[in-house]
């Protein structure tokens, strides 16, 4: 959101949405839908996103009252002890009905169709993972008749987007309830999404602005003199979610960079043969200059007591940066800090960002130096 705020300030007043194609997964799906529904006025859309995220509290996203948390804990305990024979199996650890209510009040889905008809938007896609089919499904709505696509374990499906698609995309496994769409249950779009850039590419994007949520500096490895303690359930769950959300993007960017290098190596006057239907795609990547887990740790005390107790119960690292914490922390002090961080990082590259958004000539790949070095290396 901070990056979008910076771009809104850089663009002239009254500028419509600069992104013809918008694609998002998980929390990015929420931002994508808001941008698409307010595509006529980009500054207004960015301001609306900032207003909502800056005012977030955990109870706006999931129920945090003691009674609900007690019922959920007891339900899980009974299900484990009796194998689901008493009271049925729990659907999730937390209930995110408040988020559904918040989105239903703030997002007008019919405005997406209007934006498409008026030419303010070309297409918008929201990705979710199907549990029955074991596929990553990009639900998209487009101005023109875009062909649906089918690849190994991933498809693109044309539809009229609604709240269920967004709630499915944010349904973090085990934490939030899964959502049924057309007879199949769907969960967080990051699952099975090995190619997160794919929806934008299939929908015709020639430039892709990627807003990452973590830098790729490696965590320090433990040594024999200071070995790690045995990982708790919370640490393992946090690691699984961290992998789920982080790893696909950089692998996909590496593939895209290699394809670009291959296409750029062919002289324009020569036949590209089997690659004739492919096109190079400019990419700009903006990532946080600070580890969000470290930022989250500074605001651990902002969590409601019931959620802090839950984290302690599952061993979610009472001290030190926690992967699981950053997935549950939706308090305004933390989200405001994230907005400020994104804004600062975007303004550091404001000239390149503005050029990228307005169609000016840009490098094929713009990213932090250490990422650019890795992506540009063909050494594997």
Predicted regions and their residues:
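C-terminal helical/tail subdomains of lipid-metabolizing enzymes
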Residues: 90, 103, 263-380
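Patatin-like phospholipase
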Residues: 1-93, 97, 101-103, 141-155, ...
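Alpha-helical membrane-targeting segments
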Residues: 61-94, 98, 228-229, 233, ...
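Glycine-rich, charged/polar anion/phosphate-binding loops
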Residues: 110-111, 192-197, 262-273
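Active-site gating loop/helix substructures
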Residues: 117-244, 320-329
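Short helix-terminating capping/connector loops at secondary-structure junctions
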Residues: 14-18, 115-122, 275-280
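Active-site periphery "cap/insert" segments of enzyme catalytic domains
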Residues: 90-128, 137
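Extended hydrophobic secondary-structure segments that form protein cores and membrane-embedded regions
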Residues: 20-26, 123-128, 283-287
């Amino acid at each position: 959101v901070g990056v979008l705020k910076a771009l809104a300030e850089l663009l002239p007043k009254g500028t419509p949405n600069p992104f013809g194609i918008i694609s998002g997964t998980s929390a990015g799906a929420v931002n994508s839908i808001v941008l698409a529904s307010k595509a006529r006025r980009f500054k207004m859309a960015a301001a609306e996103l900032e207003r909502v995220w800056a005012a977030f509290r955990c109870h706006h996203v999931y129920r945090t009252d003691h009674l609900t948390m007690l019922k959920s804990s007891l339900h899980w305990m009974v299900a484990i002890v009796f194998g689901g024979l008493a009271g049925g199996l729990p659907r999730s650890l937390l209930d995110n009905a408040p988020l559904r209510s918040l989105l239903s009040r703030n997002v007008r889905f019919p405005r997406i169709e209007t934006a498409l008809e008026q030419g303010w938007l070309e297409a918008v896609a929201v990705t979710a993972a199907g549990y029955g089919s074991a596929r990553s499904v990009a639900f998209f709505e487009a101005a023109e008749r875009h062909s649906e696509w089918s690849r190994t374990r991933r498809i693109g499906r044309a539809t009229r987007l609604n709240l269920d698609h967004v709630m499915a995309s944010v349904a973090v496994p085990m934490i939030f309830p899964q959502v049924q769409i057309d007879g199949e249950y769907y969960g967080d779009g990051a699952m099975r999404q090995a190619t997160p850039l794919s929806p934008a590419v299939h929908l015709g994007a020639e430039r892709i602005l990627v807003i990452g949520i973590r830098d790729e500096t490696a965590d320090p490895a433990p040594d024999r003199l200071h070995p790690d303690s045995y990982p708790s359930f919370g640490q393992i769950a946090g690691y699984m979610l961290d992998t789920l959300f982080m790893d696909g993007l950089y692998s996909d960017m590496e593939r895209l960079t290699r394809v670009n290098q291959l296409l750029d190596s062919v002289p324009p006057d020569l036949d590209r043969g089997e690659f004739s239907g492919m096109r190079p795609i400019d990419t700009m990547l903006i990532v946080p200059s600070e580890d969000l887990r470290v930022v989250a740790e500074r605001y651990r005390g902002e969590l409601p007591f019931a959620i802090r107790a839950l984290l302690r119960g599952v061993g979610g690292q009472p001290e030190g940066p926690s992967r699981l914490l950053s997935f549950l922390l939706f308090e305004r002090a933390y989200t405001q800090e994230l907005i400020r961080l994104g804004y600062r990082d975007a303004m550091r590259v404001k000239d390149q960002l503005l050029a990228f958004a307005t169609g000016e000539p840009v490098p094929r790949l713009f990213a932090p130096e250490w990422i650019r070095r890795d992506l540009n290396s063909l050494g594997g």
